[in-house]
Amino acid sequence: DAQESRGLGDVYKRQFLIADRKTLTPILWEEGANRTWGELPGAGEHALDAAASPRFPKRRWRGAGTAIPVFSLRTEEDFGVGEFYDLKRLIDWAAATGQCVIQVLPINDTTMTGTWEDSYPYNANSTFALHPQFIRLPAAGVVEDDEYRTLRNELNALPEIDYERVNRHKLRLLRRAFERHGTRTAARRDYKDFIAANRHWLIPYAAFCTLRDETGTPDFTRWGGFARYDRKTVDAYCRSHNRDIAFHCYVQYHLHTQLSEVCAYARAHGIVLKGDLPIGISRTSVDAWLYPHLFHMDSQAGAPPDAFSAVGQNWGFPTYNWERMARDGYAWWRARMAKMAEYFDAFRIDHILGFFRIWEIPTHAVHGLLGYFNPALPYSADELRGMGFDTQDGRYTTPAPDEHMLGELFGDLAGEVRATCMKEGRLLPAYATQRKVAARFPGDDEHQTRLREGLMALLDDVLFIEDPRRKGYFHPRIAPHSTHAYRRLDGERRAAFDRLYTDFFYHRHNRFWQESALRKLPVLLSATEMLTCGEDLGMIPDSVPETMHELQILSLEIQRMPKTPGELFADPAHYPYFSVCTTSTHDMNPLRAWWEEDRELTARFYHEALGIGGDVPYFCE
């Protein structure tokens, strides 16, 4: 107090602070030494230091969260699988422990065959519809009778989800509830509003599900007169199957209602729900049926080879026809994002690299090794000729096996391959693609497996891949240095190939891909107010982090997958501020399970990353 300080012979010392408005309890003091004031104001006077500027530390906000699939949640009210309503308990726990984000895997309907193969959450039959497995049955009109309770207890007692039984019984009980409550529900104002707001995707989805069940396949190319979507034809079908159509609408209405309730609950408790946006769509989906012109149905999305897959990855999804999408201002994307924003306040873009360029694989190929980037700037035949590679005779674009190569790939089966699969040193047309090879040798016995894998490796053995949409233009094959085609090059040509390969994969496309992303991503980001996070793992061009920073998209940092070459574990202290950091992805073991996988690796993490000495605990507890 200034008056109490008078006459004490000391200068008046002070500091700025932030205090609670009601209790005046200090919350944060400014940094640095005390400020001094030699001459104090008199009684009833006030002093103002207009030049003073508080030195509060720049504390950047940081938040903690939990990532978990909805299907992994467990409560007594479940029916053998985690449900939307289970998120309420998770929200309570997150709020009580100071967390602010809950991230889930994709929640769209993946029902294709009614088998466990449908359980993969990244292969949805619709990018708008929700998966019926997440519904709380009693809240959708299912009676909790003895049959229901017996089934619920039996399914909940299982150590793992019985995907087929859970979904079969849920749909059966929902059918029964629909017969009892469907007409009354359809008369409700909120139901009518839901139908009106979602008709553009809901009615085609309901027709798709009905046709799928009627024909026994989600492959719409096998639906005869319905193989090509025609609105008038489908509308007539819906009228003649109105009860089935109404059932699927009934289920989606209840899923929407339940998830909307959970979202409101999360927001009321200060918890952000973060969704997951898959990069691809299924080629047997409502979206592909309605809008085939928006996708390259003759191609497959995947990934180049990496430490986890020597032949690359083939996800099977058709790739996007971005040029066609741009004509209507990316309307399909904007509608998809708007639907997602009804439930989520943040989202993760799965494989954000796909918005810069996607790894595209022809449908005749199986291995990711035979893919190429799209969009890209492939070399023209003239460019390659100028670098010493004449593509006209096919020696660099088709396999040319010699005796040494056949022996290396097939061993004692080399003679059989030469006699049955080849003519004049080239593969016969019946074995000219990997899909044909897979169809010829589908068995799992050793003989068929060796022939199949050997022939596929033989088909991988090329240096260039011709662009399927630009004849006379060629992409260097990814990771070619172990191929026989590369090893057969003389020293001069090998050096020339190395130069063009390095330029192609590390320099030629940087600005080109950045411009490509900047035409698409801002449209997505402006469609909603969701916080955008990108999964930017893998083979990352320099332009990707630059663009993400420019567009304020958070990066993903995985401690066990460091982005700096030579690091075993990433150091969180060096992560960018605008990032999501975690110990692992959903494709990897969580921390406690990983701890017990490799004791030597765990010891290095314990001693080097955590900086703790002594014996390593056997369990991560």
Pin down the residues of each PLM region.
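Short, aromatic- and glycine-rich surface loops/edge beta-strands on solvent-exposed regions
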Residues: 13-19
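Short acidic/polar inter-strand loop motif in beta-rich domains
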Residues: 19-31
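Intrinsic disorder/low-complexity segments enriched in polar/small residues
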Residues: 4, 31-32
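Catalytic cores of glycan-processing enzymes that make or break glycosidic bonds
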Residues: 25, 33-621
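Short, small-residue-biased leader/transition segments that mark boundaries at the very start
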Residues: 2-12
